[in-house]
């Protein structure tokens, strides 16, 4: 699974279906969800999946929240051709992620 940052965010989310997992290394639900996101990615080769570490870039948490409409973490957003089409807060299993994807397809 690849990482995404603001420098390449628009490019990587501009085509097709893309799931972005906003997380932090200190967030226990985020760490528990990592395996679920990996399982989802392995069973959905048509979806690009990226992780966005909210502490990794130069922006503050408040800037990340504002720019990407992140309400809390873990936070998952599905983009279709550059536009957000689904967003979910909290721990999600791979099955729940699949249901979210199925609802937008």
Regions found by a protein language model. Give the residues of each.
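N-terminal "domain-start" segment that seeds a small globular fold
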Residues: 1-11
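The canonical Cys-X-X-Cys-His
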Residues: 27-30, 76
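Thioredoxin-like thiol-disulfide oxidoreductase module
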Residues: 42, 46-105
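Short active-site neighborhood of thiol/selenol oxidoreductases, capturing the structured segment around
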Residues: 13-25
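Typically the conserved alpha-helix immediately C-terminal to a functionally engaged Cys/Sec
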Residues: 29-43
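Conserved hydrophobic/aromatic "anchor" residues
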Residues: 9, 22-23, 79
């Amino acid at each position: 699974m690849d990482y995404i940052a603001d420098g390449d965010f628009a490019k990587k989310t501009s085509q097709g279906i893309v799931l972005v997992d906003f997380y932090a290394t200190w967030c226990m639900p985020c760490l528990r969800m990592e395996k679920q996101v990996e399982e989802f990615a392995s069973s959905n080769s048509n979806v690009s999946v990226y992780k966005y570490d909210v502490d990794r870039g130069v922006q503050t948490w408040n800037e990340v929240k504002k720019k990407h409409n992140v309400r809390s973490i873990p936070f998952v957003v599905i983009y279709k051709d550059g536009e957000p089409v689904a967003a979910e807060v909290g721990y999600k299993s791979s099955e729940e992620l699949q249901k979210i994807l199925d609802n937008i397809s």
